[in-house]
């Protein structure tokens, strides 16, 4: 099911559409449009509520047919939960539930009126752009590698979702973020035999080539060797799929210093010599979701044509194993000149990132942010709801946390105290690539901080938030919303 969006201010009881979507709270209070349709139908919705057909419980919905006095042949009534607890999360959930409820209905046009609902600390523009993002997220279907018949069935159905309101800015931003999220999800969900470093580079280069104002430069192995990217190239040694460094540029801000995003692009992570085991390795195609997220953010920025300069850097590498693979106890030299003792080949993300972060310095960033599925420790600490945020800069932390709260793509700050740095000491090199059993997310951030000295830098660990767990889990596209909103706030 695919969606296209428009705004609509037509009178709901007479609008020409296949379905009008309204809401009901757990205390049986109807949304404004539900009240209008109830009155037009002679109290039919109230009657159904009284006999228990409509409960208002969050997660429920009921499709009503042929209400007297209502032109639309269907009215979808969505449960909103408790009115006094109806905030951003509940609103997003309600919109998603509405779209999923229409999946099997013969509907090609629907009017979503949930955007009229009051959401605490949010305005009309937010309601509209978040409705677009939530609806598009709920409608997403993975089809890239399905057989022909199943693919056709999954892709069938184009619904025009008319959102009640007039805030065109909200619609424009919502569509841009939704496209960026979908782009990131599509990349993240691809199998690793398709989404190799070369594929990732070719796909992003094609996007840049087809969007005026965007450019893409691809560095190959020889280019990286010339730059001295010994850490990145060490990780790449064991794979037949050779590495790429992807550099995307959007010049919307004249001579202003650029904002630079760096995303971890491990297209598959075996763990290397420290081989992963079943119960984790099968989800390691998602280890490039940091790269997918910053590419998705670039897509959103280009679509909305943000008036700033943006550079996105993705070190695209496969961490595999053969006779040439790097080993524990190896000492490698990074692009910065710092030497690194390898304690574990499965702590490879920080090795490719440290060279990419050093490379980013040449652009003199206004701010530098890296995004990575970096540590299982972050997922243990925060679960899947929150992205881990680490930075030495309180103002940057507040900017990112505020942006995340605004779009409900939230982060939680973890410390980068000096007390953790000693855990990375090495007898044989400048730094050890692991910090021991405790505080693994923080010591990974501390490792990266050693390669961002003098930069206004933050690290986002999306190990938990980048994908859903299990056989049916998929990439989420996070934190495209957070990053795009943060960039919008800089304009």
Curated annotation (Swiss-Prot):
<keyword id="KW-0464">Manganese</keyword>
<feature type="binding site">
    <location>
        <position position="269"/>
    </location>
    <ligand>
        <name>Mn(2+) 2</name>
    </ligand>
</feature>
<dbReference type="GO" id="GO:0005737">
    <property type="term" value="C:cytoplasm"/>
</dbReference>
<dbReference type="Pfam" id="PF00883">
    <property type="entry name" value="Peptidase_M17"/>
</dbReference>
<dbReference type="InterPro" id="IPR011356">
    <property type="entry name" value="Leucine_aapep/pepB"/>
</dbReference>
<protein>
    <recommendedName>
        <fullName>Probable cytosol aminopeptidase</fullName>
        <ecNumber>3.4.11.1</ecNumber>
        <ecNumber>3.4.11.10</ecNumber>
    </recommendedName>
</protein>
<dbReference type="GO" id="GO:0006508">
    <property type="term" value="P:proteolysis"/>
</dbReference>
<comment type="similarity">
    <text>Belongs to the peptidase M17 family.</text>
</comment>
<feature type="active site">
    <location>
        <position position="350"/>
    </location>
</feature>
<keyword id="KW-0031">Aminopeptidase</keyword>
<dbReference type="InterPro" id="IPR023042">
    <property type="entry name" value="Peptidase_M17_leu_NH2_pept"/>
</dbReference>
<keyword id="KW-0378">Hydrolase</keyword>
<keyword id="KW-0479">Metal-binding</keyword>
<feature type="binding site">
    <location>
        <position position="346"/>
    </location>
    <ligand>
        <name>Mn(2+) 1</name>
    </ligand>
</feature>
<dbReference type="InterPro" id="IPR000819">
    <property type="entry name" value="Peptidase_M17_C"/>
</dbReference>
<dbReference type="Pfam" id="PF02789">
    <property type="entry name" value="Peptidase_M17_N"/>
</dbReference>
<dbReference type="InterPro" id="IPR008283">
    <property type="entry name" value="Peptidase_M17_N"/>
</dbReference>
<keyword id="KW-0645">Protease</keyword>
<dbReference type="InterPro" id="IPR043472">
    <property type="entry name" value="Macro_dom-like"/>
</dbReference>
<feature type="binding site">
    <location>
        <position position="269"/>
    </location>
    <ligand>
        <name>Mn(2+) 1</name>
    </ligand>
</feature>
<comment type="function">
    <text>Presumably involved in the processing and regular turnover of intracellular proteins. Catalyzes the removal of unsubstituted N-terminal amino acids from various peptides.</text>
</comment>
<feature type="binding site">
    <location>
        <position position="264"/>
    </location>
    <ligand>
        <name>Mn(2+) 2</name>
    </ligand>
</feature>
<keyword id="KW-0963">Cytoplasm</keyword>
<feature type="active site">
    <location>
        <position position="276"/>
    </location>
</feature>
<dbReference type="GO" id="GO:0030145">
    <property type="term" value="F:manganese ion binding"/>
</dbReference>
<feature type="binding site">
    <location>
        <position position="348"/>
    </location>
    <ligand>
        <name>Mn(2+) 2</name>
    </ligand>
</feature>
<feature type="binding site">
    <location>
        <position position="348"/>
    </location>
    <ligand>
        <name>Mn(2+) 1</name>
    </ligand>
</feature>
<feature type="binding site">
    <location>
        <position position="287"/>
    </location>
    <ligand>
        <name>Mn(2+) 2</name>
    </ligand>
</feature>
<dbReference type="GO" id="GO:0070006">
    <property type="term" value="F:metalloaminopeptidase activity"/>
</dbReference>
């Amino acid at each position: 099911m695919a969606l296209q969006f428009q705004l609509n201010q037509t009178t709901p009881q007479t609008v020409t559409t296949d379905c009008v979507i309204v809401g009901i709270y757990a205390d049986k209070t109807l949304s404004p449009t539900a009240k209008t349709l109830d009155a037009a139908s002679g109290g039919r919705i109230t009657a159904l509520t009284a006999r228990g057909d409509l409960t208002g419980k969050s997660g429920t919905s009921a499709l009503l047919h042929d209400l007297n006095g209502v032109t639309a042949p269907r009215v979808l009534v969505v449960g909103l939960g408790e009115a006094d607890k109806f905030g951003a999360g509940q609103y997003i959930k309600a919109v998603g539930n509405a779209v999923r409820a229409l999946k099997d209905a013969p509907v090609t046009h629907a009017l979503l009126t949930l955007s009229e609902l009051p959401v605490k600390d949010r305005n009309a523009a937010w309601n509209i752009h978040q409705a677009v993002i939530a609806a598009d997220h709920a409608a997403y279907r993975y089809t890239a590698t399905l057989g022909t018949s199943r693919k056709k069935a999954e892709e069938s159905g184009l619904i025009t979702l008319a959102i009640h309101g007039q805030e065109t800015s909200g619609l424009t931003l919502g569509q841009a973020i939704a496209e960026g999220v979908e782009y990131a999800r599509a990349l993240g969900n691809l199998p690793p035999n398709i989404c190799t470093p070369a594929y990732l580079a070719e796909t992003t280069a094609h996007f840049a080539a087809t969007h005026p104002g965007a450019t893409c430069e691809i560095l190959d192995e020889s280019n990286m060797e010339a730059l001295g990217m010994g850490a990145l190239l060490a990780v790449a040694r064991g794979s037949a799929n050779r590495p790429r460094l992807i550099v995307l540029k959007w010049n919307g801000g004249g001579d202003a210093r650029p904002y630079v995003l760096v995303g971890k692009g491990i297209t598959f992570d075996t763990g290397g010599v420290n081989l992963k085991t079943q119960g984790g390795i099968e989800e390691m195609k998602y280890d490039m979701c940091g790269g997918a997220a910053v590419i998705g953010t670039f897509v959103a920025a280009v679509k909305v044509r943000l008036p700033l300069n943006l550079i996105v850097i993705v070190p695209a590498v496969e961490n595999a194993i053969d006779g040439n693979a790097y080993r524990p106890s190896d000492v490698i030299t990074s692009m910065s000149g710092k030497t690194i003792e390898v304690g574990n080949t499965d702590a490879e993300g920080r090795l490719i990132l440290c060279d990419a972060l050093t490379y980013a310095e040449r652009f003199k960033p206004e701010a530098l942010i890296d995004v990575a599925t970096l540590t299982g420790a972050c997922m243990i600490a925060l679960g899947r709801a929150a992205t881990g945020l680490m930075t030495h800069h309180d103002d940057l932390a507040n900017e990112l946390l505020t942006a995340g709260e605004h779009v409900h793509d939230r982060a939680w700050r973890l410390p980068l105290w000096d007390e953790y740095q000693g855990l990375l000491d090495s007898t044989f090199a400048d730094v050890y690539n692991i910090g021991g059993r405790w505080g693994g997310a923080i010591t990974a951030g501390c490792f990266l901080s050693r390669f961002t000295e003098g930069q206004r830098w933050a690290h986002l660990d999306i190990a938990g938030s980048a994908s859903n767990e299990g056989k049916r889990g998929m990439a989420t596209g996070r934190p495209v919303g957070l990053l795009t909103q943060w960039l919008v706030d800089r304009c």
